Amino acid sequence: MGLSGKNVIFVGGLGFIGYEACKQLMAKNMASFFVFDVLDKPEDIKALQALNPKTKVYYTKFDITSKQSIKSALADVVSKVKYIDALINGAGILTDLNVELTMNINLIGLINTTLEALPLMDKNKQGRGGVIVNIASVLGLEPCPPAAVYCASKFGVMGFSRSIGDPYYYNITGVAVVTFCPGLTETPLKNNIGSKYTFEYSKKISEELNNTKTQKPEVCGAHLAQVVESHENGGIYISNQGTLAKVTPTVYWQPTYH
């Protein structure tokens, strides 16, 4: 799905990977670009707008842990431009010391945002179809002992995305669901692995993981922008050490209705 002339929302667009992806997306000649974030960075929004005057950039102060904030922000988009064509769910934290906050931001907030946006995008309701890209992690595909809580939240994102990305739903709504899994990337989130791990026992392996080779956020952001345009329902992609690769998950069980 080309993004030219489309209306796009990026939740968490002012983070490191998110902002790099935003810069890439601004080259796509979108009609409008809505950046939802708890961070307030007016200079970054101005810089985005300067990249392409053809795309109208909006900033919305956004609390992903609040259903009312989610509902109000999405309603504002529809009131301004009528249609939502693409939603990127990119808000996330890594702090295993706070289980509730990790789950509320990384998983529950993502679920609530998706479920609120989907009817607005559904071609049989208010929308014209589109794509939802949920940002999980390589730690949503494989376990990571020093970040067990973060890992659980991202496994949840993976399970949710694969479930609502079933062809049954896509054929009805016209909304594709794609999952994007960054590997270790040079961001403050990655640095938290070395200090906000699950147990005290985790310190040694956390430090070892923190010293693993990483990729630049610019590279990961470019990969994310590429995945948004793929519009491949059910697609799962890993961005790791500078390479973007599609993932085919192992299937151990299938529901009988398939």
Curated annotation (Swiss-Prot):
Catalytic residues as annotated in Swiss-Prot or TrEMBL: Y150 (proton acceptor)
Protein name: Alcohol dehydrogenase 2
Subunit composition and interactions: Homodimer.
Gene Ontology cellular-component terms listed: cytoplasm
Organism for this UniProt entry: Ceratitis cosyra (Mango fruit fly)
Reaction equation(s) it catalyzes: a primary alcohol + NAD(+) = an aldehyde + NADH + H(+); a secondary alcohol + NAD(+) = a ketone + NADH + H(+)
Binding site for NAD(+): 9-33
Entries under PANTHER family matching the protein: 15-HYDROXYPROSTAGLANDIN DEHYDROGENASE [NAD(+)], ALCOHOL DEHYDROGENASE-RELATED
Annotated keywords: NAD, Oxidoreductase
